[in-house]
Design a protein with these regions (language model features):
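Bacterial N-terminal signal peptides that target proteins for export
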Residues: 3-12
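Active-site region of glycoside hydrolase catalytic domains
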Residues: 31-127, 131-157, 206-207, 220-593
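Active-site-adjacent substrate/metal-binding segments within catalytic domains
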Residues: 141-219
Length: 593
């Protein structure tokens, strides 16, 4: 938020002032400095507030309906001290955004050549959308600034032994303060589109209740800068930064209350920004239910609700409620709000092949896809969960009512896949039938094994950083996956977008100087190979791929691995927050020229 922006609301320095404003006046919240941008009307029933938990008189336990500085202070007290970075106010774009200042590689070593010679002269359709992606918690920093409430990841990162390198998202790249410079640099580099996420606990510090006025001003200005720069905006509403207040109250994704709370957040954000956003992703990788619930909710980290303490039952109630929350937003967006853009959610999945020619290994691949993509893709394309999932889980899997099936089916406008890697799948000892009926089997409920090593003993492609053992550079796998998803798994989909793909250069964080890290040859090779195979899928295989998003805009907080694993197309110096484009950035950009 620009320091010069003034509030049209009266603000008391030590208390929270709540005002209900008629919907026709809501755009005035940011119009004073809008430079001709007009934001959408706020639906009836929303209130606004400013928050400053550091002005709390005395932090104390609060009721779920209390939205005060005191209550917010209690939430932040769960974390302990928050680290401040070197920048703590919005910075204007400077000369570093001048494209002429970007050093490029190639003096004595050229770029990576094309992999698929048959498509060297082929072109993608003019309507193909491409750009770079990032997420709020991973890049914004400013963890407790300007009224933001803590997210579950704020808490997890502040708990020892959760993040491998004991770093947090408190500061990271400080995009919250440096967004003007970042957007100017994207424009100078020639990046046509950006796919960030917005932060739920910034807009709603308690997950619901009054909207944080300062968050609105901030994101208003982010959108304004994007429009001014001519960069298309494609926004994810949820990228894992669940408001901690909702976890404290009812466990979030284990209680149906979360559907209405997410809808309340999504409705406000979409209503305000839809005219400037081309695509809404309700959720980033709802498969997060599969792996994050091995960590939470768990009694030593977070409260436990409804007898869910992690593991398989929690995974699938989370998956079920996430689907319903998505569908409720999508139905409103299409039928009532009649939005201008497209809406879907981003899936996490990788291409799998049988580890051998055996029938057991073939079934292992199918089960792998059923339990990752099928749980989420089946209901919106075919109207229900995969049969193998239902048979294995029985009563553990919540049943979709006919009304819910009708709401979910067709709720996505296209299939979005975050496709990074590939693997082989194999039958577990004893076979799938024995595993299916034995919940104590370590492989249950998926009842298959996975490896990145092929049957010939070779790894399927050059490996990524040692801290992301699942990641290999296997570009042909992505091409086959795009064919498999659209022609075999979900033939009803009209088009598919690769919403994330990227690579963690091995040992990149170990260099004592920045300059060696900038020549990230394996990452450059990765992007060349993956883009070549996306193009081949389009022009040679007839797959309707309509977009691709490189991950990531720059180095960021990589969840359980922290800051020491780097996925960025730009190098971030976490001491002074300077960003420098890597060789992979130019490999990526030059491919589209």
């Amino acid at each position: 938020m620009s320091p010069s922006t003034t509030s049209p609301l009266s603000i008391l320095s030590s208390t929270v002032l709540l005002l209900t404003i008629s919907s026709r006046l809501q755009p005035a919240l940011a119009q004073g400095a809008s430079n001709a941008l007009t934001f959408g009307d706020t639906p009836p029933g929303y209130t606004f507030a400013t928050y400053d938990y550091k002005a709390a008189s005395s932090p104390r336990p609060a009721s779920p309906a209390e939205y005060s500085n005191d209550a917010l202070a209690v939430l932040w007290d769960q974390l302990g001290p928050i680290t401040l970075g070197p920048v703590n106010s919005v910075q204007e774009a400077g000369a570093d955004a001048d494209s002429a200042r970007f050093a490029q590689p190639g003096v004595l070593h050229g770029y990576v050549p094309s992999y698929v010679r048959s498509v060297e002269t082929a072109k993608l359709p003019g309507s193909f959308v491409w750009g770079v992606a990032a997420s709020a918690y991973q890049i914004e920093g400013a963890a407790d600034a300007e009224g933001k409430g803590p997210s579950v990841w704020d808490l997890l990162a502040h708990r020892g032994a959760v993040v491998a390198d004991n770093t947090t998202g408190d500061v990271v790249a400080s995009h919250y303060w440096l967004y003007k410079q970042d957007i100017a640099r994207m424009k100078a580099l020639g990046i046509p589109a950006f796919s960030p996420s917005f932060s739920w606990p910034r807009f709603f510090p308690f997950g619901r209740g009054p909207v944080n006025e300062e968050a609105v001003r901030h994101y208003d200005d982010v959108v304004r800068e994007m429009v001014r720069a001519g960069i298309a905006l494609h926004v994810a509403l949820f990228h894992w930064d669940m408001p901690l207040a909702l976890f404290n109250e009812y466990g979030a994704w284990v209680d149906r209350k979360v559907i209405d709370d997410f809808f309340n957040y999504a409705k406000f954000v979409i209503s305000r920004y839809d005219r400037y956003v081309d695509t809404w992703y309700t959720f980033n990788e709802p498969q997060y239910c599969n792996w994050q619930f091995s960590v939470y909710p768990r009694g030593d980290l977070l409260p436990v609700f409804n007898n869910f303490t992690g593991g398989t039952p929690t995974r699938f109630i989370c998956s079920h409620l996430t689907l319903l929350a998505h569908a409720k937003v999508a139905k409103w967006y299409k039928e009532e709000f009649k939005g201008r853009g497209r809406i879907t959610f981003k899936n996490s999945g990788n291409y799998g092949e049988p580890n051998s020619t055996s029938e057991g290994d073939r079934i292992a691949v199918q089960r792998s896809q059923d339990f990752t993509l099928g749980v989420f893709g089946g209901p919106w394309t075919d109207g229900d969960y995969p049969q193998s999932v239902k048979e294995t889980l029985g009563d553990i899997l919540p049943t979709l009512t006919q009304e819910e099936k009708d709401m979910i089916k067709g709720s996505c406008d296209f299939f979005a896949i975050d496709g990074y890697s590939s693997y082989t799948a194999y039958e577990t000892p004893g076979g799938v039938e024995a595993c299916q009926s034995n919940q104590s089997n370590p492989a249950w409920p998926e009842c298959h094994g996975q490896t990145s090593v092929g049957p010939d003993g070779f790894i399927l492609g050059p490996p990524g950083d040692q801290h992301v053992s699942w990641l290999v550079n296997a570009p042909v796998g992505l091409r086959r996956y795009l064919n498999q998803i659209t022609k075999e798994l979900f033939p009803a989909v009209k088009d598919i977008v690769v919403t994330e793909f990227g690579f963690a250069e091995p040992f990149e964080n170990d260099w004592p100087r920045r300059s060696p890290a900038l020549w990230d040859l394996r990452r450059a090779d990765y992007f060349q190979g993956y883009l070549d195979n996306i193009l081949a899928a389009v022009v040679e295989d007839g797959v309707n791929v309509t977009g691709a998003w490189g991950w990531a805009l720059y180095d960021n907080f990589e969840w359980f691995e922290g800051l020491s694993t780097r996925f960025g197309l730009q190098y971030v110096n976490y001491t002074d927050l300077t960003r420098t484009p890597k060789a992979s950035m130019f490999q990526f950009l030059n491919w589209f020229k």
